[in-house]
Design a protein with these regions (language model features):
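Hydrophobic, well-ordered secondary-structure segments
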Residues: 119, 123, 137, 141, ...
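Structural signature of FAD isoalloxazine-binding scaffolds in flavoprotein oxidoreductases
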Residues: 41, 47-52, 79-98, 149-179, ...
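N-terminal amphipathic/basic-hydrophobic helices that include classical n-h-c signal peptides
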Residues: 1-7
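A generic structural signal for well-ordered coil/turn residues at beta-strand boundaries
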Residues: 21, 33, 43, 74, ...
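A generic local secondary-structure boundary/capping motif
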Residues: 77-78, 123-126, 134-138, 151-158, ...
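A generic alpha-helix structural signal
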Residues: 13, 55-59, 123, 163, ...
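Phosphate/pyrophosphate- and phosphate-bearing ligand-binding catalytic cores of soluble enzymes
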Residues: 26-27, 36, 78, 169-171, ...
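Anion-binding (especially nucleotide phosphate/pyrophosphate-binding) glycine-rich loop
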Residues: 8-144
Length: 237
């Protein structure tokens, strides 16, 4: 970071530290340690909010200060150039945004999950509860927030098939709920890529199933994925 950029970041850094713990604000962050490709340059600043209030206040601050920022999940499917990122990276960490709420009906199951939960973690929890309909996503890398952002899918299923609504932070830093019909889902795309709204939680409708059948289907899909993809090497995820 140049001296000018250091000076430019000093005041926002102090304000960020007033919102989150000081140890959760890192200057000159090596982003190769945060992305699945394991390459890339430095970010001017890296901040990790621990709750929704902190996240909203961070976004409001960055917009008020007209500071470039990027919100990431677990670091899959994107990369920072070797020249670095001249702005603030905000990480929605699985550690702080990974809660699952589940309501079971006779044949269906409505779940609401926070954006930071890993797809693999959610898949395991749903298997434990004998909830079906998420098998296609069991091997998709990253977080549920990222999956909704890009309408992730595999083996005939997509996020748009199960999403009911999405809670986001809008351009003003306020929260609102977007219905599935308003999400403008298409192949590997959603309105979020245009609006820059930030996913904070997702409500999905799944169904009850047989645990052993669910596990068997996931095992079959995992085998296919391992046969076709370089799972032991750094990649998009």
């Amino acid at each position: 970071m140049t001296r000018k950029l250091e000076e430019d970041m000093k005041r926002p850094e102090e304000k960020l530290c007033a919102i989150v713990k000081k140890e959760n604000v890192i200057l000159n962050k090596d982003m190769s340690k945060e992305v699945s490709f394991k390459v890339g340059g430095m970010a001017d600043a890296f901040v990790v909010p621990e709750n929704l209030n902190e996240l909203c206040n961070i976004i409001k601050l960055l917009r008020e200060e007209d500071i470039e920022y990027f919100v990431m999940g677990n670091g899959s499917n994107f990369i920072i150039t070797d020249k670095g990122y001249h702005g603030v990276i905000v990480k929605i960490s699985p550690k702080y945004f990974g809660e699952i709420k589940m309501i079971k009906f006779d044949d269906e199951c409505e779940i609401e999950v926070e954006a930071g939960i890993l797809m693999s973690t959610l898949s395991r929890e749903l298997v434990k509860e004998s909830v079906a309909g998420f098998e296609f996503a069991s091997g998709i890398p990253g977080t549920i927030g990222g999956a909704v952002f890009m309408n992730a899918g595999a083996y005939g299923g997509e996020m748009q098939d199960i999403v009911q609504s999405v809670k986001v932070i809008d351009e003003r830093g306020d929260t609102k709920v977007i219905s599935a019909s308003e999400m403008e889902f298409s192949y590997r795309n959603s309105r979020l890529q245009r609006t820059k709204e930030i996913v904070i939680s997702v409500k999905m409708l799944l169904k009850r199933g047989n645990r052993e059948e669910i596990k068997r289907k996931i095992a079959q899909l995992t085998k296919k994925r391992n046969e076709k993809q370089p799972v032991n090497f750094p990649s998009a995820g």
